[in-house]
């Protein structure tokens, strides 16, 4: 790894560190051999002399505090009751419907007034065309279908609006608002598709957007955690995918964790080597260190006492010589 190198022959690791392109490609080959036949193999290409690597990056959850998810789901549709809905229509349709009506395909266009309460899931606002047409026609195919439609339509506007506000999704699943705050299982792994030009902050933003987390990327950090317990924070200017390749493909040895920025700290190698020991063993280490410290103190004390004695004797000799 060198500094201030030509971009044609080197690839940046951070804003000030570089690695030889040939060396990185060799590590990439090893990485892909490890993941052979799996979706975690990485692809690479060159654009204007710049090497770009892309693929899936595994990130483990290492949060201690709960996170809050966005309450709105852009893809959810909520049907609000129509202002022109009359409950008596149900009995009217059941009474006057002919046997042929029960065979009408569900895809036929409706002829009822528009239901203006339908909300788009994609966040683009109300569906304009559906506001001008009837979203659903009360069918007489079965009594059950009519009852279902009636239940859907009979909600008060305030109740339906409350349901719409109190639902959200994560990974396509809808949850009640009471579960919008949760803590992912420690060590559970997710992944995002990234490339080697994406910085730590960009990867964090991508991951949080994927799970619709309300908290901003500044509240989190990415750490490389070694099997030994050594823990190193990825700087904002670093590239997580490059870091993953440099640490090797085996996640039993090194994992990339998402952690809180204010609750996590780096653990150097000198400290990490003691992490896995039990408390009695650590206590014995401390006792031995104290004993060694006492011996060193005694040794230094005796040394300086001897030096002081020598200096005093010399001073006395000089005084007598005068």
Curated annotation (Swiss-Prot):
The segment annotated Disordered runs over 96-140
Which ranges does the record mark as transmembrane?
Answer: none
SMART domains membership: RA
Q: Which residues form the Ras-associating domain?
A: 175-263
Q: Which UniProt keywords apply?
A: Cell cycle, Phosphoprotein, Tumor suppressor
Could you confirm whether the keyword Signal appears in this record? no
Q: Which InterPro entries match?
A: RA_dom, RASSF1-6, RASSF4_RA, SARAH_dom, Ubiquitin-like_domsf
Give any single GO term for biological process: signal transduction
Q: Spell out which residues are annotated as carrying Phosphoserine.
A: 142
A single Pfam family it belongs to is RA
Domain SARAH: from-to ranges: 271-318
- PANTHER family from the xrefs? RAS ASSOCIATION DOMAIN-CONTAINING PROTEIN 4, RASSF
Assembly and oligomerization:
Interacts directly with activated KRAS in a GTP-dependent manner.
Function in brief: Potential tumor suppressor. May act as a KRAS effector protein. May promote apoptosis and cell cycle arrest.
What name goes with this protein? Ras association domain-containing protein 4
